[in-house]
A protein has these predicted regions:
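Short loop/turn motifs that connect adjacent beta-strands in outer-membrane beta-barrel proteins
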Residues: 17-29, 94-97, 205-213
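Flexible glycine-rich, low-complexity coil/linker segments exposed to the extracellular/periplasmic environment
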Residues: 47-48, 55-70, 125-190
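Extracellular loop and loop/strand-boundary signature of outer-membrane beta-barrel proteins
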Residues: 1-4, 19-21, 70-76, 182-185
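Residues on the lipid-exposed face of transmembrane beta-strands in outer-membrane beta-barrel proteins
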Residues: 9-15, 34-38, 86-92, 102-106, ...
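Gram-negative (and chloroplast) outer-membrane scaffold detector with strong preference
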Residues: 1-58
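Outer-membrane beta-barrel "beta-signal"
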Residues: 12, 188-213
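Residues that define the transmembrane beta-barrel architecture of outer-membrane proteins
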Residues: 3-7, 28, 76-84, 191-195
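Outer-membrane beta-barrel proteins
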Residues: 20-22, 41-46, 99, 110-115, ...
């Protein structure tokens, strides 16, 4: 998971005219939007369900799961980046004072580490702690840390064409998930979707003030 926070500057283009005053706005108004945003994020994952690690959520960036910060490896990735939001939505007029809007937006981010995965599997001996080594390569975990379910069948189907039930898929290191293999996709940054429902109150165009006595 990632606890992401976004501060955006967005412009809206309405596909239909919306009237010259709040009282004359149309009943249904589609729109497009786009802009720029500042994104603060903090990827986390659950540790293995074992006495050593206690199956708890931990922040991944300080661990350097791809060797970040060690000699010969990249520096730690930033937890602040940008994103490019764009999308579309619809606004419905409920009555003279209230609107409801539904929109969906796509975000191109400036980071490939919203999920802490972007480069290659590192040499495990350079990682700083046993926790960093455990979180760097999780392919041999028989139990899913997040759900608590057994991973044996799904790993067997992925790694063995015939899915032989007599073979333990965790007995040997899995090919393609070892030092120097791609851990993520280094050719493009991470992207994400965001949807929202908004209820808004329309201020009257003229506010009548009580007479001064």
């Amino acid at each position: 998971r990632n606890d992401a926070k976004e501060l955006s500057l967005v412009g809206i283009f309405k596909l239909r005219g919306d009237g010259r005053s709040p009282n004359r706005r149309i009943a249904f108004s589609p729109y497009l939007f786009g802009g720029v945003a500042l994104l603060a994020h903090n990827p986390k994952a659950k540790t293995p369900d074992s006495p050593e690690f206690d199956n708890k959520w931990v922040a991944l960036q300080p661990l350097g799961t791809e060797g970040q910060g060690q000699p010969g490896y990249a520096k730690p990735y930033s937890l602040v980046t940008y994103s490019i939001p764009f999308g579309a939505g619809f606004t419905w007029k409920i009555n003279a004072e209230w609107n409801i809007s539904i929109e969906g937006g796509f975000r191109f981010s400036g980071s490939d580490y919203l999920d802490d995965v972007g480069g290659l599997f590192p040499d495990p001996t350079v990682l700083k702690t046993p926790l960093a080594r455990a979180m760097s390569n999780r392919t041999l975990e028989p139990i899913s840390a997040r759900t608590g379910q057994d991973r044996t069948d799904i790993v067997r189907r992925i790694t063995q064409p015939n899915a032989d039930p007599s073979v333990d898929p965790f007995a040997d290191p899995l090919g393609g998930w070892q030092q120097g293999d791609y851990r993520g996709s280094p050719t493009r940054n991470d992207q994400y979707l965001l949807s929202s429902i908004t209820v808004s109150y329309i201020l009257p165009s003229k506010i009548k003030c009580p007479p001064i006595r």
